[in-house]
A protein has these predicted regions:
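An amphipathic, aromatic/His-enriched active-site/gating alpha helix that lines ligand/cofactor pockets
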Residues: 25-35, 50-80
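Structured catalytic/translocation cores of nucleotide/phosphate-coupled proteins
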Residues: 3-6, 22-28
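A short beta-turn/loop motif at secondary-structure boundaries
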Residues: 37-42
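Active-site-flanking beta-strand signature of metal-NTP-handling nucleotidyl enzymes
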Residues: 2-10, 46-48
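Extracellular cysteine-rich, disulfide-bonded domains and loops characteristic of secreted proteins
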Residues: 81-86
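Short, surface-exposed ligand-recognition loops at beta-strand->loop->(often short) alpha-helix junctions
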Residues: 8-21
Length: 87
């Protein structure tokens, strides 16, 4: 099964570039087969990692950044693939 972990944070005012740099620097062990980082208005950063694992597998996650970088707490979601064939 393919599992996607989503991590989203909104930076404190004027700290979007720092939050993006921090998120990109977070190494996961083991590294996921696929990882993408996105940005959006209001200094939001989204990281999605894809894993070949059962839905409830113990997978490494990006931690919460230092509080001074955040406008609000980090949001996290876990999704399982709905494709019958799966990648």
């Amino acid at each position: 099964m393919t599992v996607a972990l989503m991590w989203e944070a909104r930076a404190a005012d004027g700290r979007g570039a720092e939050l993006l740099e921090w998120a990109r620097a977070q190494a996961l062990d083991p590294a996921p087969p696929r990882r993408e980082t996105f940005t959006a208005p209001a200094d939001r950063v989204l990281v999605i990692t894809w894993w070949d694992a059962p839905y409830d597998a113990d997978l490494p996650e990006i931690p919460s950044p230092p509080e001074e970088l955040l406008h609000r707490p980090v949001h996290r979601w876990r999704f399982g693939s709905a494709d019958a064939d799966g990648p």
